[in-house]
Amino acid sequence: RQNIYGARTIAGLTVDAIAGQIPELGKYVRHYDYVVAQDGTGDFFTVQEAINAVPDFRKNVRTTILVRKGTYKEKIIIPESKINISLIGEDGAVLTNDDFANKKNVFGENMGTSGSSSCYIYAPDFYAENITFENSAGPVGQAVACFVSADRAFFKNCRFLGYQDTLYTYGKQSRQYYEDCYIEGTVDFIFGWSVAVFNRCHIHSKRDGYVTAPSTDQGKKFGYVFYDCQLTVDPEVAKVYLSRPWRPYAQAVFIRCELGKHILPEGWNNWGKKEAEKTVFYAEYTSRGEGANPKARAAFSHQLKNLKGYEIETVLAGEDGWNPVKNGNRMVEVKR
């Protein structure tokens, strides 16, 4: 008789043997180093336990973790030493918590925006697929679902759910890539310092307000770039700006995006900072939909004539030539 761990091992060996005999099946086989399951059928009950088990600074190989279907209420931290992690979710894998900025910590102090996050990602070369990152605190002020400081972070088919300040792109030297993701929130729910690309994402506003609040550092060539994204709202929402500048050198560019009628004609807001109009870079390229109104846009914004210099591989290249579009599959390969 085999227990669940032995059964999984035998199954894995069997699949490997079949794939070895029929090589064309190999591309459909995905190996997992750890499995997280609430019902005890995996290696760990919680995601944090699996993260903690990953060897520090495991180079030249990825550690792949499968998260079984379920709602995991945890405050997850992926420290800088846990490099090259792939977190893969079954349908219905939700990582959630309900902290918020004005909630008190054990010392009676406010947690603050940064302290409110449900998940913190510091380790470079992190990959997540089919995971829901959620802050379930509701409309109580700042309540971050995911705080990303990692460089070369790649999110595919993930969901980011919250209200105010859902996605905090925190790392000043961080490059982040979001592909086919869903992000919802209120106020300016995508915010921070990082260079971040959103490709074919669905961006959903739950209240009037702003989609983004970049805090791009002076001298940075890029900030936020949205490619072929769809911007939608709840039925009662009618007045949303594409962005307002958290810091004076904020950058946000929307390329070929479908803008709903909730996007105001002026499109961009200066957050009451007239001087920032001279230093921000806000731009669009062939926006479409009822919210596309290039002639009425704020005078300090731009309409790009072409996309030279705004290729995804250019925006994210940095000094190491990172190109998640070309090399994305390497993010999920596991050496045997």
Identify the residue ranges that each predicted region occupies:
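Sequence-level preference for short, compositionally simple segments enriched
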Residues: 25-336
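Histidine-centered active-site loop/cap adjacent to the catalytic His
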Residues: 1-24
